Amino acid sequence: MFTKGGLGNLMKQAQQMQEKMAKVQEEIAKMEVTGEAGAGLVKVTINGAHNCRRVEVDPSLLKDDKDMLEDLAAAAFNDATRRISEVQKKKMSAISTGMQLPTGFNIPI
């Protein structure tokens, strides 16, 4: 159970956390990460909203099998998506560091 002062402190922390989350979400939306496949022969760059910004294909792949190129493009996109998700989790978990949250309370990411 929370005391009056404890509840007020928790509300203050929640407001601070909300402000930090908004700032971090704005930062993440502006970020870009690049995923790679085929040892860097295919690169896909996405932003924090998971929108594809650029696809780069090494010219040596253009004469190869179409199916392989498609697979590498998909793998590069998946790599980029995984990377931006890791950045999001890391930045969002940093927000709650130092907060005295109730046991079992998790911040949704």
From Swiss-Prot:
Gene3D superfamilies: Nucleoid-associated protein YbaB-like domain. Keywords: Cytoplasm, DNA-binding. It is found in: Cytoplasm, Nucleoid. It holds the Pfam family YbaB_DNA_bd. Its main location: cytoplasm. GO terms for cellular component: bacterial nucleoid; cytosol. One of its GO terms (molecular function) is DNA binding. Belongs to the YbaB/EbfC family. PANTHER family: NUCLEOID-ASSOCIATED PROTEIN YBAB. NCBIfam families: DNA_YbaB_EbfC. Binds to DNA and alters its conformation. May be involved in regulation of gene expression, nucleoid organization and DNA protection. Homodimer. This is Nucleoid-associated protein BUsg_467. It comes from Buchnera aphidicola subsp. Schizaphis graminum (strain Sg).
